[in-house]
């Protein structure tokens, strides 16, 4: 007779992200972002691209995996950020998900040491503080173009926040001795505390200020 699964395999009582951090106590205070911030319990945040071609499929991707995917981006390639074009600065982790995974894991360990909090909760708070509620779009009326304030959808708010957090980390470690993991940890902590030194938080304030003037 075959032995039960609990004797044949190691089955953990609690599934923790990266084997270290629980998501059971992580809360999302923003009601519009709550349905789109995926906090499912899983050890390895990797979906193998199964939601890539599905409408609104990004809502099913774990929030830590979405951060890892943004870390793999090349930086500001068509415009200046922090006064620099940074397309080739972090090419060592571009399209290399395992390296990006290790960078995010190291950043989370730094956040845990500095804040004594669950780094996933700090990340969620940083996203909430960096997600703009308003933006501007261009409309044409009578041959003249105008800027008009519009509401931002929750999924786009999440995209903008994660993109700017990763880009802010790239700016902080551009051509200096700061590692990307250290810069990412500093950016997430600053955004969670609404610190103006955070690129993501200051960018959100700038977007909303421009949108308010275009009402």
Swiss-Prot record:
Superkingdom of the source species: Archaea
Cited Pfam families: Ribosomal_S7
Tagged with keyword Cell membrane: no
Record InterPro entries: Ribosomal_uS7 (IPR000235), Ribosomal_uS7_arc (IPR026018), Ribosomal_uS7_dom (IPR023798), Ribosomal_uS7_dom_sf (IPR036823), Ribosomal_uS7_euk/arc (IPR005716)
Gene Ontology MF: a single term: rRNA binding
SUPFAM superfamilies listed in its UniProt record: Ribosomal protein S7
GO biological process assignments: ribosomal small subunit assembly; translation
Cellular component per GO, a single term: cytosolic small ribosomal subunit
Keywords: Ribonucleoprotein, Ribosomal protein, RNA-binding, rRNA-binding
Function: One of the primary rRNA binding proteins, it binds directly to 16S rRNA where it nucleates assembly of the head domain of the 30S subunit. Is located at the subunit interface close to the decoding center.
Subunit description: Part of the 30S ribosomal subunit.
HAMAP family to which the protein is assigned, alphabetical: Ribosomal_uS7_A
Family under the similarity heading: Belongs to the universal ribosomal protein uS7 family.
NCBIfam families: PRK04027.1, uS7_euk_arch
Name of this protein: Small ribosomal subunit protein uS7
Record organism: Thermococcus kodakarensis (strain ATCC BAA-918 / JCM 12380 / KOD1)
């Amino acid at each position: 007779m075959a032995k039960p699964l609990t004797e044949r395999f190691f089955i953990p009582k609690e599934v923790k992200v990266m084997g270290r951090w629980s998501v059971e106590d992580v809360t999302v205070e923003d009601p519009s972002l709550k349905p789109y911030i995926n906090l499912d319990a899983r050890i390895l945040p990797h979906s193998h691209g199964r939601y890539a071609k599905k409408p609104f499929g990004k809502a099913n991707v774990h929030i830590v995996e979405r951060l890892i995917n943004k870390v793999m981006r090349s930086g500001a390639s068509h415009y200046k950020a922090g006064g620099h074009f940074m397309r080739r600065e972090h090419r060592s982790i571009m399209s290399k998900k395992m390296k990006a995974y290790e960078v995010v894991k190291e950043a989370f360990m730094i956040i845990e040491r500095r804040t004594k909090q669950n780094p996933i909760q700090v990340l969620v708070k940083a996203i909430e503080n960096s997600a703009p509620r308003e933006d501007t779009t261009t409309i044409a009326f009578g041959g003249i173009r105008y800027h008009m304030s519009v509401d931002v959808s929750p999924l786009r708010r999440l995209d903008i926040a994660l993109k700017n957090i990763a880009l802010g980390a790239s700016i902080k470690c551009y051509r200096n001795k700061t590692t990307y993991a250290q810069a990412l940890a500093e950016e997430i902590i600053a955004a969670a505390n609404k610190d103006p030194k955070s690129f993501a938080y200051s960018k959100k304030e700038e977007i909303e200020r421009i949108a308010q003037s275009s009402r």
